Every structure is written in C-alpha cells, then in structure tokens.
Amino acid sequence: MKKLFLLFFIALTFTIVKAQTYYYNATSFAYKVVNSYGYWTNWTDWESCNVPIVMDYNNDVVTIYSNKTQIYKITKYIRKFTDSSGGSQIEFNFIDQDYDRGVMRLRIERNGNSQIYVDFTNIMWVYNVRRSR
C-alpha cells in the first residue's frame, strides 16, 4: 500500500510540475517604437512568422525562439485582470538576456485569441499566439 501511495504521489507531482510549462506558436507579430519626439508610433502591420514560445513558470522563464532567441526571466508577477475589452491578462516584470527590464503580458481575448506583449521603455512588440501543446 505504501508503494502504491508513493507511486501515486510521484505521478501527481509530475503532472503538477508538467502543467506549469506552456507551449505556444506565434503566427504573426507587430511592433511600435518611441520616435525622435518621444512619442509612440502606431503599431506596424502584422507580419507573418512561425516562432515557438515556451512559458516555463516552474523556472520563471519565458523563451521566444525567434531569429535571435529571446530569454526573459520573470522577476515579479504584477497582476491578473480583465481588460476593458473583456479579455483576461496576466502581467509580470522581467529581465532579458541583455539585463534590460520590461513588462510582459499574456492576453487571452473573449473569443479565445491570444497575444504575448513584450514592453520596454522605447519599443514594444506583440505576437499573435496559439497553444501548441
């Protein structure tokens, strides 16, 4: 009986740990920058892409496998909220592989579409994403 309980506990632990990693695939992206007058530009048109994204909450790391791999270490979970369009968002602070700080948001619209926003002080980009696993 003890062995059965131990096996069940190990299986449950593995399931819980595994559930903390989410896999996405970005299908398009857009960006905007701060112009020379200090104002944000409009978002660019969407550009197609095929970029895997892994959100590993066990290790507090988000990795975006674009042409240049982007690694974001989550430093603080800010909040989870419903935005004015009815979508739900999770927002957190991060430090990237170049030690720059920013804010990342995972947004899930009411219709199920999802985006990942990466915001710095002078540039921000957004990926349209789908869960891949």
Question: How would you describe each model-predicted region?
Answer:
Residues 20-44:
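Tryptophan-anchored aromatic micro-motifs
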Residues 103-128:
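Short, exposed beta-strand-loop hairpins at the edges of beta-sheets
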Residues 56-60, 86-89, 110-113:
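A short, compositionally biased
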Residues 68-81, 119-133:
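Edge beta-strand at a domain terminus
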Residues 50-55, 76-79, 103-108, 129:
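Hydrophobic/aromatic beta-strand elements that line small-molecule binding cavities or substrate pockets
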Residues 61-103:
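Contiguous, well-ordered beta-strand patches that form the walls/edges
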Residues 1-23:
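Bacterial Sec-dependent N-terminal signal peptides
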Residues 44-74, 115-119:
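N-terminal glycine/threonine-rich, aromatic-flanked beta-hairpin/loop signature
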